[in-house]
Amino acid sequence: MREEAATTLGKVGHADAGAALVEALGDDYWQVRLRATRSLGRLRYAPALDALIETLGHRISTLRKEAALALGELNERGAIAPLLAAQDDGDPEVRKAVRIALSQLQ
């Protein structure tokens, strides 16, 4: 249920949605964090920059991949250095997402 809420918040685009989604990045369930990460990227919620950078280092590769894609959508220059550092990720899907994100930031 919280997964769907995170997805819906990303579609609504209400001003308070971004803050709620950043809070959802700390949820106990990784699926909720995944949906929140996607939604933050969709909203281009710049205040989520630091939280998404932190998610870029998560142990679950799917979250790292989505964080990279969301960082690309934010279009914030502060994401470049962490994305460059993530180019060596052990997961090829994460590396692909990092390349996509970096191309969006150029």
Where are these regions (language model features)?
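Amphipathic alpha-helical scaffolding segments comprising HEAT/armadillo-like alpha-solenoid repeats
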Residues: H14-G26, Y45-G57, E76-D88
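Leucine-rich solenoid repeat scaffolds
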Residues: N75-Q106
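Positions within the helices of HEAT/ARM-like alpha-solenoid repeats
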Residues: M1-R2, Q31-R33, T62-R64, P92-R95
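Core register positions within helices of long alpha-helical scaffolds
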Residues: T8, S39-R42, A70-E73, R77, ...
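Acidic (E/D-rich), amphipathic helical modules within compact regulatory domains
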Residues: E3-T7, K11, Y29-V32
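Strongly charged, low-complexity linkers/loops
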Residues: A46, H58-K65, L69
